[in-house]
């Protein structure tokens, strides 16, 4: 799979680089974390949310909406699923990371999606990117054997457990609050996950 750089023109349809906020303290805090063998996502990490940059992210990037800052860390090499939100997601890399990205507009009316439409991008350590609401994404992949550390910023409450049943149409994709998910048959997702990815379960080697 070709690995593009976020400076390339093809990235612009998925998101943009955030360079107006000093994220040095957040990156250095992340780099003290021990990288687990498997990929782990935590939606809210208080040590990150207390940092000065959290206020700037809330005020500048999310228009003063309450936010949560968590992380996705560990080792990951495969796509396994795609998700999208009704808002942008900010990823802040504390190691080099690879994001596999697609577009919500390419989901079929049957709520399937062909993984051959996706592109991969390298996010250099110390870099923050805003992924637009229509950008399909999932857990970042390793850019090296040492694992991956990425902070994840979203509106507060995103990825919390649902309070009501959801079935039929796009509603069937809702896996958690503000999280619509389409899984791959080989993705190893929990029972009940919506499976609709066709094509290869993309892998970064």
Please state what every model-predicted region is.
Residues 131:
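Aromatic-residue-lined binding/catalytic grooves and analogous aromatic/hydrophobic interfacial grooves
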């Amino acid at each position: 799979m070709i690995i593009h750089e976020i400076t390339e023109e093809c990235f612009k349809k998925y998101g943009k680089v955030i360079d107006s906020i000093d994220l040095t303290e957040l990156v250095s805090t992340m780099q003290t974390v021990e990288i687990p063998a498997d990929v782990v996502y935590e939606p809210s990490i208080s040590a990150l949310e207390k940092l000065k940059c959290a206020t700037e992210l809330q005020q500048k990037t999310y228009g003063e909406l309450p936010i949560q800052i968590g992380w996705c860390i560990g080792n990951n090499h495969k796509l396994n699923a795609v998700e999208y939100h009704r808002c942008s997601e900010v990823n802040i890399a504390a190691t080099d990371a690879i994001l596999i990205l697609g577009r919500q507009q390419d989901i079929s009316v049957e709520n399937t999606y062909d993984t051959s439409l996706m592109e991969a991008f390298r996010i250099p350590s110390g870099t923050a990117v805003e992924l637009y609401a229509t950008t399909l994404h999932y857990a970042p992949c390793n850019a090296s054997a040492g694992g991956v550390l990425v902070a994840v910023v979203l509106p507060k409450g995103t990825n919390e457990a649902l309070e009501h049943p959801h079935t039929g149409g796009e509603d069937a994709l809702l896996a958690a609050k503000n999280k619509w998910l389409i899984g791959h048959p080989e993705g190893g997702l929990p029972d009940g996950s919506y499976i609709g990815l066709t094509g290869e379960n993309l892998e970064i080697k």
